[in-house]
Design a protein with these regions (language model features):
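Conserved short S/T/G-enriched processing/targeting/catalytic segments and their helical context
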Residues: 1-82, 89, 98, 104-134
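Short, flexible beta-strand-to-coil junctions
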Residues: 7-8, 86-91, 143, 155
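Short polybasic amphipathic segments
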Residues: 82-85, 95, 151
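C-terminal binding/interaction regions
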Residues: 136-155
């Protein structure tokens, strides 16, 4: 992972990821990665959507709500996808709202092998050998350590 900038307590990064379990491939880079205590989450989507998602997640955590509601700005967005990965207590969840969908989905991708790198969509032959590299990177961010050789870069 390469950290490229800091702005308003976000860490901008160039993470992209590929999942090869049900042929779900997402080759869009994270635009923002944020740490909130033991929770780390990365997002890709419009800037305002990422801001709204961050605020909704913080409200959900701080107020101990039982149900998470995706912000209206994301649900009503029709010209771009929104994806967030949330890492907490060793689990990696993917929240996504794609352009043509009317609902958002939450998936547990902790056990899905993943590869990180700008060229990850070219690496189908080695994905089965990789651990969940997303979780590795998010765990590293949680402790302010960046990869330490654990992530297989494929670009």
């Amino acid at each position: 992972m390469t950290t490229t900038a800091y702005d308003t307590h976000f860490m901008a990064s160039d993470i992209a990821f590929t999942v090869n379990r049900t042929e779900v491939t997402l080759n869009i880079p994270f635009r923002k990665v944020k740490r909130l205590g033991d929770i780390v989450f990365g997002m890709a989507g419009c800037l305002f959507c990422m801001r709204d998602f961050s605020e909704a997640l913080i409200d959900f955590i701080l107020q101990n709500k039982t149900q998470f509601e995706l912000p209206r700005s994301i649900l009503e967005k029709t010209n771009s996808d929104f994806i967030a990965l949330i890492y907490l207590s060793g689990s990696c969840l993917k929240v996504s709202k794609m352009v043509n969908d009317t609902e958002f989905t939450i998936e547990n991708i902790t056990n899905v092998p993943t590869v990180i790198g700008s060229g990850s969509f070219h690496t189908q032959h080695i994905i089965h050998d990789c651990p969940n590299a997303i979780a590795v990177v998010l765990e590293a961010i949680k402790y302010d350590q960046y990869t330490a050789g654990e992530v297989k870069y494929c670009s």
